[in-house]
């Protein structure tokens, strides 16, 4: 038996989300159908608002409602340090930790030649331009996930940045190989930042 078209479409759309298979998508679709109409309306509005009201900061690439973002505008941040991360969710993880007070730069990915992702496909050019313009920057912390792609991206960035005379550091060991920063607890992140090593 085939599902009615609206349910089938909803299942297909849920399956576009990472980690959602057909069974989970079907369960979510039927749950959505049983939700009060106001909740469904609020849910759909919040989805649209994310797309309509959020964009990338023109300086750091983090998600923001205003440009530049709140972190880039904050005059109390330590402007001598820029932490390079893969995704906006990594910024959130370090901000929740509450120990880092520098600036960020979000790459929106990592180098992955097998997937057709080269330096032009991620936010590297804007990082180099930013470092050339901002004289107060003394250290660049490469806080990339400890995956093979993250490691390769860190080495590539270090080769680009070090000739400019800037200190380039990497998070200390402590994050399991292949683990994502967003899932690390605050204590692990704090130790990784405090114990960072030169590249």
UniProtKB/Swiss-Prot annotation:
Pfam families: RecR_C, RecR_HhH, RecR_ZnF, Toprim_4
HAMAP family named among the record's database cross-references: RecR
PANTHER family associated with the record: RECOMBINATION PROTEIN RECR
CDD domains to which the protein is assigned, alphabetical: TOPRIM_recR (cd01025)
C4-type zinc-finger residues: 57-72
Location of the Toprim domain: 80-176
Keyword entries, A-Z: DNA damage, DNA recombination, DNA repair, Metal-binding, Zinc, Zinc-finger
The organism's taxonomic lineage, starting at the top: Bacteria, Bacillati, Bacillota, Bacilli, Lactobacillales
UniProt similarity note: Belongs to the RecR family.
Function text: May play a role in DNA repair. It seems to be involved in an RecBC-independent recombinational process of DNA repair. It may act with RecF and RecO.
Protein's GO biological process: DNA recombination; DNA repair
Keyword Isomerase: no
InterPro entries for this protein: DNA_Rcmb_RecR, Rcmb_RecR, Rcmb_RecR_Znf, TOPRIM_dom, TOPRIM_RecR
UniProt protein name: Recombination protein RecR
Cited Gene3D superfamilies: 3.30.60.80, 3.40.1360.10, 6.10.250.240, RecR Domain 1
GO MF annotation terms: DNA binding; zinc ion binding
